[in-house]
């Protein structure tokens, strides 16, 4: 029963890591990255559709994204969605594809993005600590219900704390790597 609590906590913490990685992917670092467009949704035949489901996204150069729609009639809708997004990148429509040239980041923008990365990383650590709290509460409930002994509870709490420490360290590493990526010119 104790292993179930730890496995459940590990699984939820892994989901937090994956969520953080997706969030970091959406923060542009002056280089083209297809995940920048993950949050862009296009009005396609009356339905909000993720851009990556109606177009292929390629990276022909280090700072250029090329969006090639599967259906050429959706080109204007895609361009409209990209203009409405908060990417800060102006799309260039050449009739068959849309080019997105990623502008170089200024020093000030880099610092602002680094602050945002820290904030996102801190939110991920808070989520992990909440998962730890839930796991600890579950362990204490089991001890109260006499399903586990007090000694088993102490061991379980140590194991949960170790898993949490590992998860927080992983988040710190991810955050430091993203900050380094942002701040290098």
From Swiss-Prot:
Gene Ontology biological process terms in this record: translational termination
Gene3D superfamilies in the record: 3.30.1360.40, Ribosome-recycling factor
Family matches, as CDD domains: RRF
Membrane spanning stretches: none
Record carries keyword Plastid: no
MF terms in GO: ribosomal large subunit binding
Function comment: Responsible for the release of ribosomes from messenger RNA at the termination of protein biosynthesis. May increase the efficiency of translation by recycling ribosomes from one round of translation to another.
Location, primary (coarse class): cytoplasm
Organism of derivation: Streptococcus pneumoniae (strain Hungary19A-6)
Subcellular localization(s) per the UniProt record: Cytoplasm
InterPro entries (UniProt xref): Ribosome_recyc_fac (IPR002661), Ribosome_recyc_fac_dom (IPR023584), RRF_sf (IPR036191)
Protein family per UniProt: Belongs to the RRF family.
Keyword field: Cytoplasm, Protein biosynthesis
Pfam families in alphabetical order: RRF
GO cellular component, as recorded: cytoplasm
Name of protein: Ribosome-recycling factor
Keyword Membrane among UniProt keywords: no
């Amino acid at each position: 029963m104790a292993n179930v609590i730890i496995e459940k906590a590990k699984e939820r913490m892994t989901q937090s890591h994956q969520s953080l990685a997706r969030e970091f992917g959406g923060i542009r670092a002056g280089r083209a990255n297809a995940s920048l467009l993950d949050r862009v949704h296009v009005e396609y035949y009356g339905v909000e559709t993720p851009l990556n489901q109606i177009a292929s996204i390629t990276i022909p150069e280090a700072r250029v994204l090329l969006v090639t729609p599967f259906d050429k009639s959706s080109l204007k809708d895609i361009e409209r969605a990209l203009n409405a997004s908060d990417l800060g990148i102006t799309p260039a429509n050449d009739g068959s594809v849309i080019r997105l040239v990623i502008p170089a980041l200024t020093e000030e923008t880099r610092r602002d993005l680094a602050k945002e990365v820290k904030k996102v990383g801190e939110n991920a650590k808070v989520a992990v600590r909440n998962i730890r709290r839930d796991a600890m509460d579950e362990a204490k409930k089991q001890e109260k219900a006499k399903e586990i002994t007090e000694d088993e509870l102490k061991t379980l709490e140590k194991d949960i704390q170790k898993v949490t420490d590992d998860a927080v360290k992983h988040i710190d590493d991810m955050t430091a790597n993203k900050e380094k990526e942002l701040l290098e010119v």
